[in-house]
Curated annotation (Swiss-Prot):
Signal peptide (residue range): none
Organism of this sequence: Mus musculus
Molecular function per GO: identical protein binding; peptidase activity
Residue numbers bearing the N6-succinyllysine modification: K287, K288
Gene symbol of the encoding locus: Lactb
Name assigned to this protein: Serine beta-lactamase-like protein LACTB, mitochondrial
Active site positions, chain numbering: S162
Primary localisation category: mitochondrion
Subcellular location: Mitochondrion
Top-level enzyme category: hydrolase
Biased composition (Basic and acidic residues): 248-279
Expression induction or repression: Down-regulated in a number of cancer cells.
Enzyme Commission code: 3.4.-.-
Length: 551
């Protein structure tokens, strides 16, 4: 009997092992039952007890707790044990093979995102990273929909805000390459509905090139020209180093500029993402003046770009075209009208063709009526520091400057297409097996060349180029800080913040001769909370992955 019981117990334990191997698939698989022999009756009770006991012990050793799908930290591409076989629809998805060499960078970057998310009180945030053209990490933290406890995931769709400007630039560049658009003709050549302008009694010309780099003098959301000029003067005064004590006039200017700064920063630093440090200094909220810019919250639907021009076309220019940088989303509304006239297509139709070419199949204009899968809700903090839904807005007046929805994956595709076009001309193509870029190398070089008299407000080391901010390579002292060349654009809208950053590889002869483009790191981050500065976070993440890539 002892020999028989030992045999049955061993068989039961052996059967139990694979069923409780630590994976969800194994945990739900029903184990096979032991085969009963003819002499079993005498020890039935004891035999079953020993068998079940062995099965329970092995199961408890191997079982892994299953995280609830509602856990907001549980979505995205994460590093899991090989035994954890997960269904495609589960909140965790196994890390792609390309990610396994970046485990340190992923862990470090995830920790950084948790810190940023907690610091600003953001409901949800999604990140994506690609290395040399391959997506190696994407993950969502927190909630896409707080009310229904829908977790963020890589497929979550959010407002990308001013990254829309970089998308519009591709349309302009394609038309320029095709000879259908002259960047230096007055805009009235394409859009006669936009009136000719004067500045201080002098007739001036607004061109497509000036619009792209925010040098046209067309206003942003702030309509008070005096406030804007005082703020610009105050900022210029603050940047002067080593000056003597201010005069009475300078003190007055500082006082005026400081007061106005509180008001005019709402649409720019608080909504357009231009002051990362200020955004981080306190929890984002509905502070005084945050919601006084009525045009940010328009509910009116505009049928086309020409109709949208009536919001600003008769307003005076704030500066002489070409003289000063004034960030303007309305300038891109005029650019959308130029795209329509130069292409012969409606702006959105032309953009959808571009998205199709770039394989950006989840990128669409934001509209309230259509059902858009995986669309997040958008949030802000009220005066009582309570999380609330943002008011309904209609962005049809500014598709080109801040009206698109997208995912981190689509933004990575876009970044890689731009990087490929930028680099492909530098690579040896002896077998002619490299395909042309979506944009020509000379076009990309033009787009990523800093423009004089501009500002890159999300990184003071850089300048604005053509719908991208660009920081150039620089090192002033030996064995000291080295500034890497990169291009990026941030975005800030009602209830949303975003960034797309491209860190090109510093190519050497070995890479040029033996490798293929794109070479570099792309980082995209989207968040369903307004006023969250993300550029420095994206740059830190890019540098973390660049370290692992170099090892």
């Amino acid at each position: 009997m002892y020999r028989l019981l030992s045999s049955v117990t061993a068989r039961a334990a052996a059967t139990a092992g694979p069923a409780w191997d630590g994976g969800r698939r194994g945990a739900h698989r029903r184990p096979g039952l032991p085969v009963l022999g003819l002499g079993w009756a005498g020890g039935l009770g004891l035999g079953l007890g020993l068998a079940l006991g062995a099965k329970l012990v092995v199961g408890l050793r191997g079982a892994v707790p299953i995280q609830s799908p509602a856990d907001p930290e549980a979505s995205g591409t994460t590093e899991l044990s090989h035994e954890q076989a997960l269904s495609p629809g589960s909140p965790h998805t196994p890390a792609p093979p390309a990610a396994r060499g970046f485990s340190r960078a992923i862990e470090s970057s995830r920790d950084l995102l948790h810190r940023i998310k907690d610091e600003v009180g953001a409901p949800g945030i999604v990140v994506g990273v690609s290395v040399d053209g391959k997506e190696v990490w994407s993950e969502g933290l927190g909630y896409a929909d707080v009310e229904n406890r829908v977790p963020c995931k890589p497929e979550t769709v959010m407002r990308i805000a001013s990254i829309s400007k970089s998308l519009t630039m591709v349309a302009l560049a394609k038309l320029w390459e095709a000879g259908k658009l002259d960047l230096d003709l007055p805009v009235q050549h394409y859009v006669p509905e936009f009136p000719e302008k004067e500045y201080e009694g002098e007739k001036v010309s607004v061109t497509t090139r000036l619009l792209i780099s925010h040098l046209s003098g067309i206003r942003h959301y702030e309509k008070d020209i005096k406030k804007v000029k005082e703020e610009k003067a105050y900022k210029a005064l603050k940047m002067v180093k080593g000056t003597p004590p201010p005069s009475d006039q300078e003190k007055e200017l500082k006082e005026k500029g400081g007061k106005n700064n509180e008001k005019s920063d709402a649409p720019k630093a608080k909504v357009e993402q231009d002051s990362e440090a200020r955004c981080r200094s306190a929890k984002p909220g509905k502070k005084k003046n945050d919601f006084e810019q009525g045009e940010l919250y328009l509910k009116e639907k505009f049928e086309n770009s020409i109709e949208s021009l009536r919001l600003f076309k008769n307003d005076p220019l704030f500066f002489k075209p070409g003289s000063q940088f004034l960030y303007s989303t309305f300038g891109y509304t005029l650019l959308a009208a130029i795209v329509e006239r130069a292409s012969g297509y409606k702006y959105l139709d032309y953009m959808q063709k571009i998205f199709h070419d770039l394989d950006m199949l989840t990128t669409v204009q934001e509209e309230n009526e259509p059902v858009i899968y995986n669309r997040a809700r958008f949030y802000v903090y009220n005066k009582k520091k309570r999380l609330v839904n943002t008011p309904y807005v209609d962005n049809s007046y500014k598709w080109a400057g801040g009206g698109f929805l997208s995912t981190v994956g689509d933004l990575l595709k876009f970044g890689n297409a731009m990087l490929y076009g930028y680099q492909v001309g530098q690579f040896k193509n002896s077998n002619e097996n490299l395909l042309p870029g979506y944009l020509k190398p000379e076009t990309m070089v033009m787009m990523w060349t800093p423009v004089p008299n501009t500002e890159m407000s999300w990184d003071k080391e850089g300048k604005y180029a053509m719908a991208w901010g660009v920081v150039e390579k620089k090192q002033t002292y030996g064995s000291c800080r080295k500034q890497r060349h990169y291009a990026s654009h941030t975005g800030g809208a009602v209830g949303a913040s975003s960034v797309l950053l491209v860190l090109p590889e510093e190519l050497d002869s070995e890479a040029v001769n033996n490798k293929v483009p794109p070479r570099g790191i792309i980082v995209s981050i989207i968040c369903n909370m307004q006023s969250v500065g993300l550029n420095s976070t994206a740059l830190k993440i890019a540098l973390e992955f660049d370290k692992d890539r170099a090892d």
